[in-house]
Amino acid sequence: MRDLDRERDYNQHAKGPEHMIINGQVVKVSDMVVHRFRMGDVEDPVLYAAQPIHAWQQTEAGKFVMEHAMESPWWVRHMDPYDYGYQFAIVARMKESDQTFYTLKYVGTTN
């Protein structure tokens, strides 16, 4: 999983929606935030973020994303202005059909 430490890095990496031909069909592919978590003000946030990221990857939702992502998912770190800590987001580039499945099955659940 790649790490992008700043908003600028994310914007340079992020791509707009694309259309690709996969198995003879035109498929729309775009970025989707698949998981978010917050962390307090710690000395090394990247080191402390490894455990929640790994734990999420072991869930059913995390395994689905790792299997269906078009390229390796990445995480982005932002400052959290409310508690002076950090916000992390995991972003994956997936087909529109996989995004719909993910949203219906996993968004709003504890998994």
Write out the residue ranges for each language-model feature.
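Structured alpha/beta or helical-core interaction and ligand-binding surfaces enriched in interleaved
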Residues: 2-83
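Short, compact, well-ordered microdomains
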Residues: 80-111
